[in-house]
């Protein structure tokens, strides 16, 4: 009896393991085996032909070279197929396995989450190999977030892992304003990773791998376990790339932003999200110290602060308003994203506590944010080149120069702020001393009341911060 061509079938249906399993179960006769093999060969041939016919600027790598993101310093971007990455990940020694984790993206299903030296991947209890399309290199992870799941009676948390090139609006397609697609990374997965954990501790027998014993000590809760394990692999990846600052797990913080809308299911807890639609899809906006994230439906969108050109508002009604964010998507092109139906109660918090805090409403500040980002990226590239042994001395010199430029930009910004303060002092009227002092006292008392009133609500959040 002939056998299924599992390699071709895996390439064609890498994002649909349910279909692949169904084919394996249905292949109970030579005729069906041949039929499935012929279908896989035909589809793969068509996909490859379609990719070859497309212009280079619009070509999307399919199956045999399914990649995503922007390459980091010394990552290889060519000649690495998805099957090669899966095989490479499967061959590495398993450091830690966390069983029965609820994954939502790329696929909604329970998987075992596996951590090795170079990879994080998902697999099932029935198959020791990684699931095709669910393998990520640590070096390709650019952002990690730890966020509460909105509107749940029982507290749950989402972890979001964003590889390079998977979170900007023009990541996978040609931008309508002329931006080029971002360069591919070396991960087999073309999507972010999103999984959900409960507030409870892992059940006995949920951990396996080389460091399972050490991990058990940190497993007071799922969040404390993940926050103990993941940063170690991110730091190691940063070291391999020659970067001084590893990727951090960024958590939501009610002191950074808290919604004014009261949560009916957990009234004593401040909400750190705002309901918002993107097109016809409903979701939630999180205003974080590194940028604005919209989730948790595909496609996830993250807008880093240093890529935001401006923020404006439209359709301001009695109960709702829309927020428009203009984003730098590369090569001098920008794209506008509109988030609609935000609650009017949150306008003040968004506009004053976040947008004005980071000067996101001021287009003139966007160039400075962009310059700082590019200087920092160039410095990182210099460090990565030195780590790879390629033009090490030149890369180090470039890194020093770029860091000098970055410090210069920061000093110029500090001088600008100082000049504004000096202008305020020149406009100061000595005759209003009494009133000013009185107003200052009142303001301080109000600030004190605000801090005190927030302590009770921050207790729950502090527990989450301890986990970090």
UniProtKB/Swiss-Prot annotation:
Keyword field: Chaperone, Chromosome, DNA-binding, Nucleus, Transcription, Transcription regulation
Ranges of biased composition (kind: Polar residues): 65-82
Basic and acidic residues bias (residue ranges): 365-380, 407-418
SMART domains: Rtt106
Spans annotated as Disordered: 55-82, 365-468
Gene Ontology molecular function: DNA binding; histone binding; nucleosome binding
Family: Belongs to the RTT106 family.
Name of this protein: Histone chaperone RTT106
Species assigned in the record: Pyricularia oryzae (strain 70-15 / ATCC MYA-4617 / FGSC 8958) (Rice blast fungus)
Origin organism lineage: Eukaryota, Fungi, Dikarya, Ascomycota, Pezizomycotina
Primary gene name: RTT106
């Amino acid at each position: 009896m002939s056998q299924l061509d599992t390699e071709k079938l895996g390439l064609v249906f890498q994002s649909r393991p349910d279909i692949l399993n169904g084919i394996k179960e249905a292949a109970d006769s030579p005729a069906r085996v041949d039929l499935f093999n012929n279908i896989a060969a035909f589809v793969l041939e068509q996909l490859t032909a379609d990719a070859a016919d497309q212009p280079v600027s619009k070509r999307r790598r399919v199956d045999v070279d399914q990649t995503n993101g922007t390459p980091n310093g010394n990552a290889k971007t060519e000649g690495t197929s998805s099957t090669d990455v899966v095989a490479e990940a499967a061959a590495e020694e398993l450091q830690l396995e966390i069983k029965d984790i609820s994954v939502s993206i790329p696929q909604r299903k329970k998987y075992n989450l596996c951590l090795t030296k170079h990879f994080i991947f998902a697999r099932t209890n029935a198959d020791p190999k990684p699931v095709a399309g669910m393998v990520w290199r640590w070096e390709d992870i650019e952002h990690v977030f730890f966020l509460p799941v909105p509107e749940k009676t029982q507290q749950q948390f989402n972890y979001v892992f964003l590889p390079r090139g998977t979170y900007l609006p023009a990541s996978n397609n040609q931008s309508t304003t002329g931006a080029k697609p971002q360069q591919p990374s070396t991960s087999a997965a073309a999507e972010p990773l999103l999984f959900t954990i409960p507030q409870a501790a892992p059940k006995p027998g949920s951990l396996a791998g080389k460091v399972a014993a050490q991990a058990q000590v940190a497993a007071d809760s799922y969040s404390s376990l993940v926050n103990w394990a993941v940063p170690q692999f991110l730091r190691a990846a940063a070291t391999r790339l020659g970067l001084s600052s590893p990727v951090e797990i960024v958590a939501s913080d009610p002191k950074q932003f808290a919604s004014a809308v009261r949560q009916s299911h957990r009234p004593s807890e401040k909400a750190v999200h705002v309901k918002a639609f993107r097109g016809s899809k409903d979701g939630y906006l999180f205003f974080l110290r590194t940028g604005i994230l919209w989730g948790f439906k595909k496609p996830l969108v993250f807008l880093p602060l240093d890529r935001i050109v401006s923020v404006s508002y439209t359709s301001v009604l009695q109960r709702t308003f829309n927020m428009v964010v203009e984003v730098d998507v590369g090569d001098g092109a920008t794209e506008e994203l509109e988030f609609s139906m935000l609650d009017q109660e949150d306008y003040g918090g968004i506009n004053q506590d976040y947008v004005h805090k980071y000067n996101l409403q001021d287009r003139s500040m966007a160039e400075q944010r962009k310059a700082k980002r590019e200087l920092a990226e160039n410095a990182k590239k210099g460090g990565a080149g030195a780590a790879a042994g390629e033009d090490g001395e030149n890369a180090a010199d470039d890194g020093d120069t770029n860091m000098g430029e970055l410090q210069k930009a920061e000093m110029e910004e500090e001088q600008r702020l100082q000049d504004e303060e000096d202008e305020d002092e020149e406009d100061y009227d000595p005759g209003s001393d009494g009133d000013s002092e009185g107003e200052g006292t009142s303001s301080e008392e109000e600030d004190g009341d605000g801090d005190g009133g927030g302590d009770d609500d921050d207790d729950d959040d502090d527990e989450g911060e301890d986990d970090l």
